[in-house]
């Protein structure tokens, strides 16, 4: 008999709208003794069936829903269908842009909560962030090996969010033979080196693909400051688009070494490129004090808020860094600024940048609103999937 999670009165509304999370404070009682990751049925207080998901006893999100179809069992065939659907949903994009690197599975937005899978050429990188995902690891690896027989499979489940599930970090080869690092992928006709072992996240920020191409429209014959550059790909696009000068700034010497490599693998000279291993916040203040200016500035900082308690501090951080960046822009210059925090609403982010402009005593115009690339879809019932917000602002 299925283990049953009964909700408190009135707490069924989000599931009836197909939001895939059940929080611990919504649960009335539990019929049975589920193990971590085990499949459970969720019912409303009056007993009517709502969904079927994975039990996570140590998390605030105690059930992540796999399916809202009562007839659908959670088994090997379920995961095979979900993986196939995810690939089909990306095939047009892959053909159109000639991609060899893309997000294959975007967790909740692809109906696979806690499961992220990125493809870099012939390497699949899995990030399993929930007890349910962890429980089905072997099945996922078997299916991926069948559906992508030429690919190695590597795990990068080494993020802090696993602690909230009571899970330890896990990394390593799951299937096949890993090629020598870095792997070279291609997007929009540009080659990019990716280290899936030592790189950020699963190795690279695939979600900024479209925004890199948009940024390239503003850089011809311009001076570009690329902040938090990681492996320098905004700068790489700028170099190919004819920027007069580029400064790539990051605290990581390893990331900057890969930025140099990216120029080389694309056959581009970096005579006009400066690689600066520095703290961006300190450097921007230094440049302001020195009176240094740029035509284009890219701000792509790491996440400032991991939870709601940190949001106010994040707002202050975003305002401060955008204010200083605007002070460094030449008249008519362009700022491309981003927030990758899912807790930051797009309208609030725009207000923060507008307030930063007031403090910087600069008049700005918002000329583009940016988001994540389309291989990072946003489920209609899962607004949390809309995490990357960006703005292009021209300053006068």
From Swiss-Prot:
<dbReference type="InterPro" id="IPR029063">
    <property type="entry name" value="SAM-dependent_MTases_sf"/>
</dbReference>
<keyword id="KW-0808">Transferase</keyword>
<dbReference type="InterPro" id="IPR015947">
    <property type="entry name" value="PUA-like_sf"/>
</dbReference>
<keyword id="KW-0698">rRNA processing</keyword>
<dbReference type="InterPro" id="IPR002478">
    <property type="entry name" value="PUA"/>
</dbReference>
<feature type="domain" description="PUA">
    <location>
        <begin position="2"/>
        <end position="79"/>
    </location>
</feature>
<dbReference type="InterPro" id="IPR023542">
    <property type="entry name" value="RLMI"/>
</dbReference>
<dbReference type="Pfam" id="PF10672">
    <property type="entry name" value="Methyltrans_SAM"/>
</dbReference>
<dbReference type="GO" id="GO:0005737">
    <property type="term" value="C:cytoplasm"/>
</dbReference>
<dbReference type="Pfam" id="PF17785">
    <property type="entry name" value="PUA_3"/>
</dbReference>
<keyword id="KW-0949">S-adenosyl-L-methionine</keyword>
<dbReference type="InterPro" id="IPR041532">
    <property type="entry name" value="RlmI-like_PUA"/>
</dbReference>
<comment type="function">
    <text>Specifically methylates the cytosine at position 1962 (m5C1962) of 23S rRNA.</text>
</comment>
<keyword id="KW-0489">Methyltransferase</keyword>
<dbReference type="GO" id="GO:0003723">
    <property type="term" value="F:RNA binding"/>
</dbReference>
<dbReference type="InterPro" id="IPR019614">
    <property type="entry name" value="SAM-dep_methyl-trfase"/>
</dbReference>
<protein>
    <recommendedName>
        <fullName>Ribosomal RNA large subunit methyltransferase I</fullName>
        <ecNumber>2.1.1.191</ecNumber>
    </recommendedName>
</protein>
<keyword id="KW-0694">RNA-binding</keyword>
<dbReference type="GO" id="GO:0016434">
    <property type="term" value="F:rRNA (cytosine) methyltransferase activity"/>
</dbReference>
<dbReference type="InterPro" id="IPR036974">
    <property type="entry name" value="PUA_sf"/>
</dbReference>
<comment type="similarity">
    <text>Belongs to the methyltransferase superfamily. RlmI family.</text>
</comment>
<keyword id="KW-0963">Cytoplasm</keyword>
């Amino acid at each position: 008999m299925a283990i049953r999670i009964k909700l408190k009165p009135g707490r069924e509304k989000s599931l009836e709208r197909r939001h895939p999370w059940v929080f611990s404070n919504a649960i009335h009682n539990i019929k049975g003794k589920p193990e971590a990751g085990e499949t459970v049925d969720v019912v409303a207080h009056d007993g009517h069936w709502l969904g079927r998901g994975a039990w996570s006893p140590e998390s605030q999100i105690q059930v992540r829903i796999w399916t809202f179809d009562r007839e659908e069992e959670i088994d090997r065939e379920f995961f095979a269908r979900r993986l196939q659907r995810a690939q089909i949903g990306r095939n047009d994009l892959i053909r159109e842009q000639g991609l060899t690197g893309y997000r294959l599975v975007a967790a909740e937005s692809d109906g696979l909560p806690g499961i992220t899978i990125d493809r870099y050429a012939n390497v699949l990188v899995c990030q399993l962030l929930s007890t349910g995902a962890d429980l089905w690891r072997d099945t996922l690896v078997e299916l991926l090996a069948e559906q992508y027989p030429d690919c190695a499979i590597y795990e990068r489940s080494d993020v802090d969010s696993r602690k909230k599930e009571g899970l330890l970090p896990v990394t390593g080869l799951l299937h096949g033979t890993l090629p020598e690092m870095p792997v070279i992928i291609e997007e929009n006709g540009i080659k990019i080196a990716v280290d899936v072992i030592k790189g950020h996240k699963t190795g690279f920020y695939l979600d900024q693909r479209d925004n890199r191409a948009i940024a390239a429209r503003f850089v011809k014959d311009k001076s570009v400051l690329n902040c938090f550059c990681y492996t320098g790909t905004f700068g790489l696009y700028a170099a190919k688009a004819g920027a007069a000068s580029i400064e790539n700034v990051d605290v990581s010497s390893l990331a900057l070494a890969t930025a140099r490599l990216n120029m080389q693998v694309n056959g581009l000279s970096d005579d006009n490129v400066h690689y600066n291993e520095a703290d961006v916040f300190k450097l921007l203040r230094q440049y302001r004090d020195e009176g240094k200016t740029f035509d284009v500035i890219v701000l792509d900082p790491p996440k400032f808020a991991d939870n709601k308690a940190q949001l106010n501090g994040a707002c202050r951080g975003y305002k401060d860094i955008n204010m200083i960046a605007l002070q460094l822009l030449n008249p008519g210059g362009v700022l491309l600024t981003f927030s990758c925090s899912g807790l930051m609403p797009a309208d609030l982010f725009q207000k923060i940048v507008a307030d930063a402009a007031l403090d910087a005593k600069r008049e700005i115009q918002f000329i583009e609103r940016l988001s994540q690339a389309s291989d990072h879809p946003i489920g209609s019932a899962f607004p949390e999937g809309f995490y990357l917000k960006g703005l292009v602002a021209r300053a006068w």
